Amino acid sequence: MNTEILGVVAQVALMVILAYPLGRYIAKVYKGEKTWSDFMAPIERVIYKVCGIDPKEEMNWKQFLKALLILNAFWFVWGMVLLVSQGWLPLNPDGNGPQTPDQAFNTCISFMVNCNLQHYSGESGLTYFTQLFVIMLFQFITAATGMAAMAGIMKSMAAKTTKTIGNFWHFLVVSCTRILLPLSLIVGFILILQGTPMGFDGKMKVTTLEGQEQMVSQGPAAAIVPIKQLGTNGGGYFGVNSSHPLENPTYLTNMVECWSILIIPMAMVLALGFYTRRKKLAYSIFGVMLFAFLVGVCINVSQEMGGNPRIDELGIAQDNGAMEGKEVRLGAGATALWSIVTTVTSNGSVNGMHDSTMPLSGMMEMLNMQINTWFGGVGVGWMNYYTFIIIAVFISGLMVGRTPEFLGKKVEAREMKIATIVALLHPFVILVFTAISSYIYVYHPDFVESEGGWLNNLGFHGLSEQLYEYTSCAANNGSGFEGLGDNTYFWNWTCGIVLILSRFLPIIGQVAIAGLLAQKKFIPESAGTLKTDTLTFGIMTFVVIFIVAALSFFPVHALSTIAEHLSL
């Protein structure tokens, strides 16, 4: 047990230590300063030339958003066409068939918005061709989209007064070529050395210890898993994600994959400080996020390593913790850490089944996604925190009787309205769709039965499964309580709607706020200016997040996770 805790501490320390140099490097990339990756410049110039892009052309926030939305619309059509026709495309040695239109819609939307919700199993639901040219392609593009959006906001924050926030296409390309691709190659090389498959052969016939023959799926897993983790995508190459021994073979690969989830979101927060030359602001934000993250780690690790009281009552020893739904090669501690790392970000990959975690662990996993602010997805995670900074600045300004200001710009009614809509959209979407699904389950059982029954668990946990699904969609996370039968018309379509609303409306609002503030006249700091880089303001922001985001979900948790915990 002590060794497991040491492993948890080592992984967290590694993330924090490496985030600092990576954050400095990311800031240099977006500012166009000299870096070791300048050798990629000729490749980037070819991309710009082929695509007809002028990387030096500045965009205002409306042009920036237009480019972002057009890009995503194009790739959505691309993905739909390939998924519904994959059975007739090459690189399909196992003969997997095409996806149905509703499943393809859900899959395409999910990967396009960086959620990677999977209502299919990777081995049988996709081919090698669509794994590479839909899934892996989307995992690079969507991660780079979020990073580009944050780069635009950083540029607007660094300028005193400007009408432009940079070039979306330039930020998108350098995010791929200079950040995501190099890190993916490093992680992929480690995975190959540890035994993750990388090839295009079909299923391999093996003889098990029991003497039975079994077909084991293979494929280019080592190419896809790194960006799955680094881009906070999370969509597993295999159906059970990183629980699978070929996707995550050893404790070393588990450490590397877990580190890969959080390293860029952490680094992006610090990059903000380097880019804007406001390191204290970045440290303040980083400190609040890290505190919330560590609270979750402590709760989940203690819950999972402490075992299940129901099993204790049977007189069964639980020296290794609550091992239901966990891999013996990884242990309860590493699984508990991963469950927090994957939910404080929008990653959603798993190395154990969240549906089998203790009730309080499940509550922490959901709360991380419902708050949706602690580190979050690459780029967009900090942008969610940015929304609450605007709200906290406005409230603080009213409390001291001064016009609210952030980084020398007045925060007025227009920005506040947008921030409020973005902040309230998240709980609204989750709770409304959970209520709809619960209503249908209770009052239209024939419809539910026609779709396979939906729930494997009734009562408190059944509500948790529905709540988790929509929470995961709204947070662009993609993990799930897998007791829910979600590959149905109802869940495919409703989850797709939640995914679209929860991805693009917040990004539009956050980029709009940054663009509007950037155009305003810069006001030099004075003795009466509210300092946003202090511990006091960090606590204020934390309280605002807790009140607006966390408390909105208390009633539904009282009926699900908390009630289940008290019933043990």
Swiss-Prot record:
The keyword Membrane applies. Its main location: membrane. It is found in: Cell inner membrane. Keywords: Cell inner membrane, Cell membrane, Ion transport, Membrane, Potassium, Potassium transport, Transmembrane, Transmembrane helix, Transport. GO terms for cellular component: plasma membrane. The keyword Cell membrane applies. It is a multi-pass membrane protein. GO terms for molecular function: P-type potassium transmembrane transporter activity; potassium ion binding. Pfam families: KdpA. GO terms for biological process: potassium ion transmembrane transport. The chain crosses the membrane at residues 3-23, 64-84, 133-153, 179-199, 255-275, 281-301, 375-395, 418-438, 497-517, 536-556. Part of the high-affinity ATP-driven potassium transport (or Kdp) system, which catalyzes the hydrolysis of ATP coupled with the electrogenic transport of potassium into the cytoplasm. This subunit binds the periplasmic potassium ions and delivers the ions to the membrane domain of KdpB through an intramembrane tunnel. Belongs to the KdpA family. The system is composed of three essential subunits: KdpA, KdpB and KdpC. This is Potassium-transporting ATPase potassium-binding subunit. It comes from Bacteroides thetaiotaomicron (strain ATCC 29148 / DSM 2079 / JCM 5827 / CCUG 10774 / NCTC 10582 / VPI-5482 / E50). The lineage of its organism: Bacteria, Pseudomonadati, Bacteroidota, Bacteroidia, Bacteroidales.
